[in-house]
Amino acid sequence: KQLVLSMGINTNDAIISMENLYAINRKLIDPTANRYFAVFEPYVKITLKNLAVPKVVQLYKHPNRKNEIREIKLNKAEVVLEKNDYEANSGKEIRLMGLGNFVLGKGFAEFTDNDLAKAKGFPHLHWLPSDTELKITVLNEDGSELQGLAETGLKDEVSKVVQLERKFFCKIESMENSTLKAIYTSK
């Protein structure tokens, strides 16, 4: 309805802008969609230096609902990052979201501190523990499938729309043999 109203009524053929549709979708789903991490192929495993593990990282399910927490258990000092994030930021200071500030090197990330104010200018990267077993397949808007790993809490979101942080919104359709099946819904 909002899309039709935004175009106005006239006798000319209407051209629908996908950007307008995505913007309207975001307004509708953003207030309720919980946030999670997913790391898509290809990804790389990196070792974390100077970080005490095991560690439980607590993140908000939604930035406006501070009482709803999700946890990521980091049992060993290894995480996976998407290969393009790793390559684009190698040699730079980065923020691994919820985990801390690091200098990203060749095959490793060295913990420097947890100063969030300092990290404002850093690239903020999503990550998952290297021992993550939950897989995800997302049917993309162009019909292709994205394969990757997903945060464990996504198992509780079947039939809901979620935001995969730094990626897109998708609807978690089902869970089959330790693999979540999802459909892309909006940027």
Regions found by a protein language model. Name each.
Residues 1-187:
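Catalytic adenosine-cofactor/nucleotide-binding cores of aminoacyl-tRNA synthetases and other
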